[in-house]
Amino acid sequence: MVHLTICLPTRNRQAYCIKTIAALAEAEGPDFEVVVADNSDDPAPLADYLANQLADPRFRLIPPGDSVLPMVANWERALEHARGRWIAVIGDDDYIDPRLVAIIRRYEVLYRDVDAISWECMSYNWPDNRPVPTLANIPVGQGTGPNSTEALANQLFRWSERKRRPSVGVGIYHGAIKRSLMERIKEAYGGRYFEHPNPDWESSCKVIMQARLIIHSQRPFSVLGACAASNSAATLSPKVMKQRIETFEKETTGPISLYRPEFPFSLKTGGASICLSIAVTTSWFCQTYGVSLDGFGVNFAHAAMDECVFSATQDEYEAKVACFQSGFDQWDDGRWAGHFKPAPFKPPRTINQISGVGDDRLNVREADIGAATPAEFYRFGEHAIAPMDSLINGTQVFAL
């Protein structure tokens, strides 16, 4: 049996996807596979590349259907085709180290009940997605061990950290989930692996609720890439954010809407943010499945204020404040509106100009390193972190 399936859902980003596939194919060994779920308008580029240029039996293509699928449906069919004992999902402009298979095997020996593995991720902007100076970052921590599901639940469901994004890296997106856990999730939640239009954060919710043992590594095994065509690129431009949301809404069908009266914040306004998108997903899950939201109202008000701090211009700041204020005024009859008190706008002194180590991450100016893809950046970043072979063999590194 294949030990790890890497699912690669993609839509209309064939050039990036082909580079990602080529990088994964460089890894040796028959114990992993890659399932490419193509949801593109033109099926030819990926079909031709996989059949005639790559011709690697470890890579399987699911061609586009008769009509465009919502993202959640494309993810669903990718998992339905997975054969691996463990499953991971990455984006078509990301990278994951296939040697993760050996790490999984080691964790299965060290932690008998493990059914979910998470790790810190490197982040990287493709060369075409740098409208302003950008920093890539490399987590430099070395610890590994069990994660408390109670603590993770507080961070994700109640937003206990009061930051613009919960620091929860658990889930099938840039994580590895045992097949048995995914089947348990499917049985518990309506006979599907995924329901919500934001399947990555939905997966985090469900894994935290259903996992028996989550092991977290501070050492990264993957790269979150952001190309110019990605949803992640929207974080660098409010205009792009609005365009991405409009396209997403247009192509999303199904019973679950991104707008809900129970949490009346709109993602269609100019001030929408990743922060709000995550909150829409986590609040939906908690309200749908009866998970406690005690403390969420006040905590999210602080998280929203933190999001407003990350504004490059006065216009961006005002749009975010207006978006959040409108939602807080309507939510629970304005119960939490008094807690949303954003500080006045302060323009950033510099934008991604300073490299160095902070918060256990090495920040590097991307214009200076020459890496053209996430895979190349991963190989660059490995010079600053524990060697993979040492982790696999359990040998000590960086000893005093």
Q: Where in the sequence are the language-model features?
A:
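Nucleotide-sugar donor-binding/catalytic module of glycosyltransferases
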Residues: 1-242
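C-terminal subregions of glycosyltransferases and related glycan-biosynthesis enzymes
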Residues: 120, 222-400
